[in-house]
């Protein structure tokens, strides 16, 4: 009878209203101290699914009221969330689940990908211009869009996760990204330049460009290529500072001598924390930028770059090193503390190395050299050889094999 179902409905609603205050109390004034058994579960899941917060998220906020717990926050791993819910249930907890798995497909309205739409976009820890910069993205770079909160939380082809202002990227669907990836492009080969509204350097500029930028190739007019931006804007770029991508790849060299020559071309470019472009670089950003100009994608930070390629122990006379090896510096291991990588450069031969420290410069490990760097010699740790391992390791690839560029 209708009256029976009405009473049942009222009973269910009454139960729900009883439950809501319980979680409201947990949310507002509840105990945020995590019980040891839950902390142990959370730590084990974080180590398994998101050991490096730069490339994976497991940010969970817990509010407890006895054996009731409210979960909030975000994670990039659906498996981690499932394991957390199962683990809490086994420990006897009643869970109100508000933990969000990224990407937020509903909030993003299906546009879970994006393309960098400015010459160099700044990626930050939090969605605010005053927040610390983490890394940068280059025009034409495909990204995964995870979340929107005024800004966009994105993941770059080296898997770095950070926030970017909405102007920095053009959000797209997977199909639109595939169309962009498959389109013929023009690659910027000069460290800096401009796109113009007409095929003339006397015309209005559309935007600046930096080395490694990619634009869609729309045609040719005299000494200019006609190009299109990810958002559809059009303009003209001089042939003297750019090249069709296919031609660029055909003439590309990935040997040590060519890469070192590119590194030398950036001499004097200022140090910029989190910089990964020809406008400014930090130490690992310098390595990433130089290699990317040769279509090599490596992890973002020095502490990540230290684990790609072949580990090389540096002999006292440096005879184990080859030009093009990455060399790492930092705190040496002691019985009390682990080794910690904080700086990286590239070995160029004859006991010299090139790196970004203040600006891009060359220094030496030899006390007899006028470029001797006693400070960095004292904190030298080891080297890695990456060039023979391109496309042989998951985190050492090219734009032809990286998953972001091949969708």
Tell me what each language-model feature is:
Residues 116-139, 188-217, 271:
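Beta-loop motif signature
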Residues 263, 275-294:
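Active-site nucleophilic cysteine motif
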Residues 82, 86-107, 156-187, 200, ...:
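Boundary regions of SH3-family modules and the immediately adjacent low-complexity/disordered segments
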Residues 13-19, 26-70, 74-136, 141, ...:
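N-terminal targeting leaders
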Residues 140, 152-156, 164, 212, ...:
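SH3/SH3-like beta-barrel fold
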């Amino acid at each position: 009878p209708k009256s029976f179902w009405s009473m049942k409905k009222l009973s269910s609603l009454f139960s729900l209203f009883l439950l809501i205050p319980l979680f409201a109390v947990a949310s507002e004034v509840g105990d945020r101290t995590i019980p040891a058994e839950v902390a142990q579960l959370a730590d084990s899941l974080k180590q398994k699914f998101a050991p490096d917060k730069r490339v994976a998220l497991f940010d969970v906020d817990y509010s407890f009221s006895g054996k009731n717990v409210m979960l909030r926050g975000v994670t990039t791993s659906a498996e981690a969330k499932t394991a957390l819910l199962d683990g809490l249930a086994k420990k006897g907890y009643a869970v109100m689940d508000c933990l969000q798995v990224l990407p937020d497909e509903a909030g993003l309205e299906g546009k879970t990908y994006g393309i960098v739409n400015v010459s160099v976009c700044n990626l930050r820890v939090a969605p605010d211009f005053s927040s610390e910069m983490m890394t940068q993205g280059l025009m034409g770079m495909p990204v995964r869009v995870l979340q929107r909160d005024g800004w966009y939380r994105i993941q770059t082809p080296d898997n770095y996760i950070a926030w970017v202002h909405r102007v920095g990227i053009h959000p797209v669907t997977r199909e639109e990204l595939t169309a962009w990836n498959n389109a013929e492009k023009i690659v910027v080969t000069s460290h800096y330049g401009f796109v113009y509204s007409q095929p003339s350097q006397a015309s209005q500029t559309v935007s600046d460009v930096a080395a490694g930028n990619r634009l869609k190739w729309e045609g040719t007019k005299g000494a200019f290529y006609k190009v299109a931006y990810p958002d559809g804007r059009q303009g003209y770029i001089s042939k003297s500072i750019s090249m069709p991508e296919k031609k660029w790849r055909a003439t590309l060299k990935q040997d040590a001598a060519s890469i070192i020559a590119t590194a030398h071309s950036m001499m004097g470019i200022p140090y910029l924390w989190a910089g990964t472009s020809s406008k400014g670089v930090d130490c690992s950003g310098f390595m990433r930028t130089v290699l990317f100009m040769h279509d090599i994608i490596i992890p973002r930070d020095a502490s990540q770059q230290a684990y790609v390629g072949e580990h090389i122990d540096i002999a006292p006379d440096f005879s184990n090193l080859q030009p093009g090896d990455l060399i790492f510096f930092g705190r040496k291991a002691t019985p009390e503390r682990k080794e910690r990588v904080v700086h990286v450069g590239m070995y160029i031969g004859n006991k010299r190395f090139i790196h970004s420290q203040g600006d891009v410069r060359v220094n030496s490990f030899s006390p007899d050299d006028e470029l001797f760097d006693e400070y960095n010699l004292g904190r030298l740790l080891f080297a890695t050889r990456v060039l023979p391992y391109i496309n042989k390791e998951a985190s050492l690839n090219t734009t032809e094999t990286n998953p972001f560029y091949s969708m």
